[in-house]
Amino acid sequence: MNELSDDEFHDTLSCEDHLGMVIRGHIHIEHWVDRFLLSAMPCYDKYAEDINADYETKTLLCCALGLTPELKGPLALIGKLRNRFAHRPSYKLTKSDVDNLYAALSGTHQQHLKKSYKALALRYQREEASFSKLGNIERLNLLFMLLRAKLKKAHAQLNENA
């Protein structure tokens, strides 16, 4: 998979419909879950096919291998949201979907997301400076961005400590 910059990832998610955004976001999140597993278990790729772990199992393995447990809930909800779209092609993203994902974040991650968005909104003179007042698509995009960033950081920390 091509490594996208943060801006490219944001743009990729922004140009998709609900289905495309959720599926594409999930693919990129799972990519970083796999990268974390490979860094934590250098032989993981050799046995990954035999292990045949689904996304949920991979996220649990990540937590067992040192990924902050604060990400367990949000990562699980990303998988459930992806499954809703995969198994119900006409499914539409709801406010509740996004609210539940946001609520699954730790208080620290919620505050980080709000502060980061506010700073960006001021910097780029966005009309809406409050995360909570954004639409579902915009909030989900930022939630994907946050989770991807947390996984990338955890992956980098594993590599630094190796």
What are these model-predicted stretches?
Residues M1-A162:
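Amphipathic alpha-helical interface elements
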